């Protein structure tokens, strides 16, 4: 809670570990200059208008709220082994933020370099997040996303239990090696979507993916569009897909049903596949 919190205001710190281990403290309009690990091993902090300019600002910390704060480019690897952190209305210029954290809530946060960000974390909520960079969210789990605008490849590689709403992802190799993903009302553009993933569902989505949706087990699509998508569904099993409009080509799916308005080309040339287990229904063919 916020009761009995001491306050640090309009201050400046540099050097190594200047506020090591502080707790139950509000930091307002405070800048951390050159010096590693300024807030290591801290707990129950409320940061407002803080500027971090150097490495490892929040390691091994618990119960941190952050508002209107800037993590500059050199505040890299900034938030590791930290639990229950909430960041609102803030800008993160540094890569490699968040590693092995439990309990991350982001609201109106801009990552200008999201490379290797949020790896091996769990219990994540993101709302109104703008991110640019490769490998966001790798091997993380229990993720709820609403309005993520991402430009960056390999998003959520190896993630588990992911729910995405109202998002726009420009990402090749998105959702590889995942388990239990549901995506609603979103646009995804980028080749090789969701390979090697188990249990992925797309509802009201627009997908543009060269060789997308291959090697998936349990793929569900409801009211989706596949713009410029070819060689889809290769070696995909347990498909339940309902696609509006057309798809360029479908290649060697293993099992399930695909309903689509029109397919330009169906390629079934893999002798290992029992074609009686797959049904492709084209609405324009009655």
State the predicted function of each range.
Residues 2-286:
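Long, distal/terminal scaffolding or interaction modules
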């Amino acid at each position: 809670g916020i009761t009995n919190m001491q306050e640090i205001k309009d201050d400046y710190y540099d050097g190594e570990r200047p506020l090591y281990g502080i707790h139950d403290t509000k930091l307002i309009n405070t800048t951390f200059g050159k010096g590693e690990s300024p807030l290591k091993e801290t707990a129950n902090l409320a940061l407002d208008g803080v500027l971090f300019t150097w490495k490892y600002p929040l390691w091994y910390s618990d119960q941190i709220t952050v508002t209107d704060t800037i993590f500059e480019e050199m505040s890299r690897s900034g938030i590791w082994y930290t639990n229950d952190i909430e960041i609102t209305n803030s800008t993160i210029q540094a890569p490699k933020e968040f590693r092995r954290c439990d309990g991350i809530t982001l609201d109106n946060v801009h990552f200008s370099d999201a490379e290797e960000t949020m790896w091996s974390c769990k219990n994540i909520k993101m709302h109104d997040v703008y991110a640019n960079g490769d490998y966001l969210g790798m091997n993380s789990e229990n993720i709820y996303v609403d309005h993520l605008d991402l430009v960056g490849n390999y998003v959520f590689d190896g993630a588990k239990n992911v729910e995405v709403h109202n998002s726009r992802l420009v990402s090749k190799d998105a959702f590889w090696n995942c388990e239990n993903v549901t995506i609603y009302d979103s646009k995804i553009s980028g080749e090789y979507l969701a390979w090697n993933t188990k249990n992925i569902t797309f509802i009201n989505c627009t997908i543009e993916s060269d060789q997308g949706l291959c090697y998936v087990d349990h793929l569900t699509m409801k009211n989706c569009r596949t713009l410029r998508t070819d060689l889809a569904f290769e070696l995909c099993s347990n498909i339940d897909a309902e696609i509006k409009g057309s798809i360029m080509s479908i290649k060697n799916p293993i099992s399930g049903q695909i309903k689509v308005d029109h397919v330009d080309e169906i390629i079934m040339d893999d002798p290992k596949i029992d074609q009686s287990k797959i049904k492709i229904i084209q609405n324009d063919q009655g």
